[in-house]
A protein has these predicted regions:
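Short glycine-rich, Thr/Ser-proximal phosphate-binding strand/loop in the N-terminal lobe
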Residues: 2-48, 86-90, 165, 175
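Glycine-rich phosphate-binding/hydrolytic loop that grips phosphoryl groups
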Residues: 7, 116-130, 282-338
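Glycine-rich phosphate-binding loops at beta-strand->alpha-helix junctions
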Residues: 14-15, 265, 269-295
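N-terminal phosphate-binding loop and adjacent alpha-helix
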Residues: 27-67, 96-98, 242-245
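Glycine-rich phosphate-binding loop and adjoining helix at the ATP-binding site
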Residues: 44-48, 67-70, 77-139, 184, ...
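Phosphate/pyrophosphate-binding loops at sites that engage ATP/ADP/AMP, CoA/4′-phosphopantetheine
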Residues: 50-71, 114-115, 262-274
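Glycine-rich phosphate-binding loop of actin/hexokinase-like ATP-binding domains
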Residues: 133-201
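A mobile "lid/hinge" subdomain adjacent to the ATP/sugar-phosphate binding pocket shared
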Residues: 188, 194-273, 308
Length: 338
């Protein structure tokens, strides 16, 4: 019987699944398999959704539930390295039952199958790294842009999680905002309590809270000025893709913030590659190329031998589930060789 590893990416509204053949390394799901998360209804409700969604996904792709020998799970942070949700959880985990909830342990108990855990940024970073380098020795740093800014550091195919599981929380690294002329000296606030970190400029939250209001003052007749802030922030990307001047300027500001962060990392780690992913980059190849050029322009000039390699994390929203599956496969292989 074939041995299958499941990858589960828990988001705020949806759970993404993938299935990986442990013997061949082939993914059985080419794109996304989704199931409603219902995370705002509490931990136990969401846990049931995860289990039910996995059963439905396995059935859809002709996989016997008993063939699933390991599961990889990722969630938004902050959480411990073992999958215990922090009291300062993400906006997806606002129900009173979430703080301190052992999601990994609870899922393992429900399934009766070993479950490994990764932060969602680390999971996507692992998939991006392995897609680019495979088993070759290399170091990569990833930025995953969504509601916030996640990411990960991967060294020779291993995620650097850190002592408490907070390794790769790149969004909360401070950057020199004064080097971004469009900000006019402003150091925007972040939900974490810091001012002027990367996430405070480069995230959907940053667009809604800081950048869109700032640029609408400069473009008072822009159509987005008459749209509710939350909805308007989500429409900035489509306007920018069509070449809208104001929205391109917003994305350029975000790119320059990320470029400044990458510059700091280059001087600290000199990685083999930077990878960028998340919903913000699910755009046309032309817009991706423009935005990567803007990120590079935001980096102060480097020595020629330090010229950074910038890449897009493949497979879009499926990246997290795929990275979680790879982590579970590695855990299974390590246990077998111990």
């Amino acid at each position: 019987m074939q041995r299958i590893v499941a990858g589960i990416d828990l988001g705020g509204t949806a759970i993404n699944y993938t299935l990986l053949n442990a013997d061949t390394g082939a993914f059985l799901i080419p794109g996304l398999a989704e199931h409603p998360a219902r995370s705002k209804e509490g931990a136990q409700v969401c846990l049931t959704q995860i289990v039910d969604g996995l059963a439905a996904t396995a059935a859809k792709y002709g996989v016997d539930r008993g063939a699933i020998v390991a599961v990889g799970l990722d969630t938004p942070g902050p959480a411990s390295a073992t999958g215990v949700l922090s009291a300062k959880g993400s906006t997806n985990f606002v129900h009173a039952s979430w703080p301190g909830f052992d999601l990994r342990g609870g899922l393992e108990q429900r399934l009766g199958t070993p479950v490994t855990y990764l932060n969602d940024g680390n999971a996507a970073a692992l998939w991006g790294h392995m897609s680019l380098f495979g088993s070759r020795p290399a170091t990569s740093v990833s930025a995953i842009i969504g509601t916030g800014l996640g990411g990960g550091l991967v060294v020779d195919g291993r995620v650097v999680e850190g002592r408490n599981g907070f390794g790769g929380e790149i969004g909360h690294v401070l950057i020199p905002c004064e080097a971004i002329p469009a900000l006019g000296g402003v150091r925007p606030p972040c939900n974490c309590g810091r001012f002027g970190d990367v996430e405070s400029v480069c995230s959907l939250t940053a667009i809604e809270r800081t950048l869109l209001p700032m640029f609408l003052e400069r473009y008072p007749r822009h159509p987005l000025g008459g749209v509710a802030p939350g909805r308007a922030a989500k429409e900035v990307r489509s306007y920018a893709e069509r070449g809208d001047e104001m929205c391109r300027a917003i994305f350029d500001t975000q790119a320059r913030a990320l470029g400044l962060f990458f510059d700091q990392v280059t001087n600290l780690l000199d990685p083999d590659a930077f990878l960028i992913g998340g919903g913000a980059l699910e755009v046309s190849p032309e817009f991706q190329a423009w935005w990567l050029a803007a990120v590079r322009a935001g980096m102060p000039p480097q020595r020629e031998e330090q010229e950074p390699r910038l890449h897009i994390v493949p497979n879009g929203d499926a990246a997290g589930a795929r990275g979680a599956a790879l982590q579970a496969l590695r855990g299974m292989q390590s246990a077998a060789s111990a």
